[in-house]
UniProtKB/Swiss-Prot annotation:
Listed GO biological process terms: protoporphyrinogen IX biosynthetic process
Origin species: Listeria innocua serovar 6a (strain ATCC BAA-680 / CLIP 11262)
Underlying gene: hemL2
Coiled coil start-end: none
EC number in record: 5.4.3.8
Cofactor: pyridoxal 5'-phosphate
Pfam families in the record: Aminotran_3
PANTHER family: GLUTAMATE-1-SEMIALDEHYDE 2,1-AMINOMUTASE (PTHR43713), GLUTAMATE-1-SEMIALDEHYDE 2,1-AMINOMUTASE 2 (PTHR43713:SF1)
Catalytic activity: (S)-4-amino-5-oxopentanoate = 5-aminolevulinate
Protein name as it appears in the record: Glutamate-1-semialdehyde 2,1-aminomutase 2
Pathway: Porphyrin-containing compound metabolism; protoporphyrin-IX biosynthesis; 5-aminolevulinate from L-glutamyl-tRNA(Glu): step 2/2
Length: 432
């Protein structure tokens, strides 16, 4: 494929934008470098770049675009919002409609509040949990990304009984020491952390199904045990459902798995492609939020009509009968096709697939936590990513990210993708 215009634009972007991108995940650093492709437009399941190349898209903007690009119903809602004014700074009736839709879909949301992003939603749930419990520390799980605010940019110390250390320049050690990080799916380490720090732990922050070191499901009984142990300790359980809400069913991963948290943070899908976040939970906890309580949270753009109307429209689309069954069908087809191609070419892969989301790890070992994901072959993934791009398949440029199937993908798209995987695997074994 010709990428000359993408290269020209990236060179120009480097002169004006830090790193040439507005989020590091859009660079190709995670796949061995190279020029990120600059897109011109998107429609349905397809991207079109500035050089005129077409791609089947599984990036889905890192998750929000579950209905495909430029869905007519969502486009109509956004157009209506633009015509009537996109920002008021006052309440609107649409906020009520959307809040009710979220509550009906995810019953643990007894009260909700809108924010501008998933990062803001997670950040505020932690503040509210601290206000409710009077404690300061949180427990999180290694490799789970919860946004770019200081408190969660923390990596594990030397073990579950040690405090976290900064995972980014600019994060202070004192901030990092408010976080205890333990391996996902490891109850022994979780119990040890509670034994050491229990009376200081305000909340346990959990991705109920991990989406940030690939798609990783909880081990049987793990989430139930986390809930029970946290509550015995007087700590709250916060589910970060920024990726998972409405991903696997019309509702949250908590509905899908049947395990209920105290607070939930959401984003991505619920905005229909526009910036949004939301959090909610038990009434007695949510009443700690201003103006009712002492935990302050605000936002100029929070609950703006454009994002709210886009979110309402997205959820209306997701109520289509049989949609999530189709996600499961196509996800299973893709998993099976990738695994067959891998066997054919003698390439070791593990495919973690949950409904319409999956991750291809270059390893013959199961991946159940961050350490196992980190041990997979990143160099081979980088070559695979670039090969797939040349075959017209757009993936996230990182071995830790997921492929997302949208309502716009067709069976023909899935079959074309499987053929591309077969072609690229063939080239990989030839050293190309």
């Amino acid at each position: 494929m010709d990428h000359s215009m993408s290269k020209k634009l990236h060179d120009e972007a480097l002169l004006h934008i830090v790193g040439g991108v507005n989020s590091p995940s859009r660079s190709n650093k995670g796949v061995g470098g190279g020029i990120p492709v600059t897109m011109e437009r998107a429609n349905g399941a397809y991207f079109y770049d500035v050089d005129g190349n077409k791609y089947i898209d599984y990036l889905a903007a890192f998750g929000p675009i579950i209905t495909g690009h430029a869905h007519p119903h969502i486009t109509e809602a956004i157009t209506k919002a633009a015509q009537n004014g996109v920002l008021y700074g006052t309440p609107t009736k649409h906020e009520i409609t959307f809040a009710k839709m979220l509550k009906e879909a995810i019953p643990s949301l007894e009260k909700v509040r809108f924010t501008n992003s998933g990062t803001e939603a997670v950040m505020t749930t932690i503040r509210v949990a601290r206000a409710y419990t009077g404690r300061d520390k949180i427990i999180k799980f290694a490799g789970c990304y919860h946004g770019h605010f200081d408190l969660v940019l923390v990596e594990a110390g030397s073990g579950p009984s040690t405090l976290g250390i900064p995972d980014s320049a600019g994060v202070t050690r004192s901030t990092a020491e408010e976080v205890i990080t333990v391996p996902f799916n490891d109850l022994t380490s979780f119990k040890e952390a509670l034994a050491v720090w229990g009376d200081q732990v305000a909340a346990v922050l959990v991705e109920p199904i991990v989406g940030n070191f690939g798609m990783v499901a909880p081990a049987e009984g793990f989430l139930e045990a986390v809930n029970e142990l946290a509550h015995e300790n007087g700590s709250l359980v916060i589910y970060d459902e920024v990726i998972t809400a409405f991903r696997f069913m019309y509702g949250g991963a908590q509905n899908y798995l049947g395990v209920i948290p105290d607070l939930t943070a959401m984003g991505k899908i619920i905005g229909g492609g526009l910036p949004i976040g939301a959090y909610g939970g038990r009434v007695d906890i949510m009443e700690k939020v201003a103006p009712l309580g002492p935990a302050y949270q605000a936002g100029t753009h929070a609950g703006n009509p454009a994002s709210i109307l886009s979110g309402i429209a997205c959820l209306e689309v997701l109520q289509e009968e049989g949609l999530y069954d189709r996600f499961e069908k196509y996800g299973s087809m893709l998993k099976e096709g990738i695994e067959k191609a891998a066997i054919k070419h003698g390439i070791a892969v593990t495919v973690n697939q949950i409904v319409g989301a999956l991750t291809v790890y270059f390893t013959d070992e199961p991946v159940t936590n961050y350490a196992e994901a980190g041990a997979t072959n990143g160099d081979l993934f980088g070559r695979f990513f670039k090969g797939m791009l040349e075959e017209g398949i757009n993936l996230a440029p990182s071995k830790y990210e997921a492929w997302f199937i949208t309502s716009a993908h067709s069976e023909a798209d899935i079959l074309e993708t499987i053929q591309a995987v077969d072609t690229v695997f063939g080239k990989l074994v030839q050293g190309k």
